[in-house]
Amino acid sequence: MAIHGYDGKAALQQVNQFWSMLDDMCENNPEEYRSFIQRQMREGAEFHSPPQSHTCIRTAVLGANEGILYINICGWKRVPAPASDKEPVPVCGGRMEKLTEEKEEYSVVDAAFNPEVLQTTEKDKEEKENLCLLALNFIQQQHNLTLSQHYKLTNDKIKGSIRDTKQRLMSTKTCKSTLNGSQSEPAPSLLQQICSLQNTESDEDSSIELSIEQERKPARSGLIEVISSTELDQPQPQLPKHQLTICPDGNGSSRILQLCVELPGVRSVSQCQLRISEDDILLEVEDIYYLLLPFPELVKEETCTAKFNKKKQTLNVTVNVL
């Protein structure tokens, strides 16, 4: 997947330096290395945490496409906080969805701010009103709409569910600093450009073991996997065939969620990127497959293990249910 304004060669040089640093740290200071890896995993879990509902406003779409619009204002740790009180306030928005509930037809869209911004506005009624207007104007510009500036706070903090909100935000995410009008896709950090899947070869079944468990010792070979991207006009990725089941574990004391994904055409784990949170899983194979799957129940993402079978070209993911 291409990233505009992203220098692939420079990033790969940084990754090589980063790998060298980790290699030295693991060899010379194992405790510091372990602490570093665990800290990155905690921060990664926070980054992939779902948005939190805050306020829902109801307004009207004017003009040819007139109708009712609900805007969910939520907190999301993926959205950066402004560097200071004088800096622009970043906001992210997702796709708009048209729904029908009972006899009411309406549209719903989401505007996400950093949680610290929302906490600040809670202390000041005027600031909260300004935040609502910022969200309203942002959605108006993002979707090229004419919206009524008169809105009403709903009794519920969110229209729909957090899961739906997260899917809309992740599908076509746009970020903007609301005070200066600059708009851009958020650039991924260095660690986000590195595949975090650990792999070990098995001669018996030609499979590759993948794990994100914190307590396992990191493998010396293949701990970090560099993924480069190029600007190519490729067809849209397909939704792979998959099966999701929940069953008791071997002891019968808890339940596990099992996901089997068929990936025909995939021959190497280096093609796969896997991210998991407590309520969903994201699997990407560049330009081939894309799967964003909500879980029917919350899971303990730190217990997730995955196994890629090269012969069958399948990925099997197992994780404990909360």
Curated annotation (Swiss-Prot):
Organism: Danio rerio
Family according to the record: Belongs to the PIH1 family.
Name of this protein: PIH1 domain-containing protein 2
Signal peptide: none
One BP annotation, GO: box C/D snoRNP assembly
InterPro entries given in the database record: PIH1/Kintoun_subfamily, PIH1_N, PIH1D1/2/3_CS-like
UniProt gene name: pih1d2
GO CC aspect terms: cytoplasm; R2TP complex; ribonucleoprotein complex
Pfam families in UniProt: PIH1, PIH1_CS
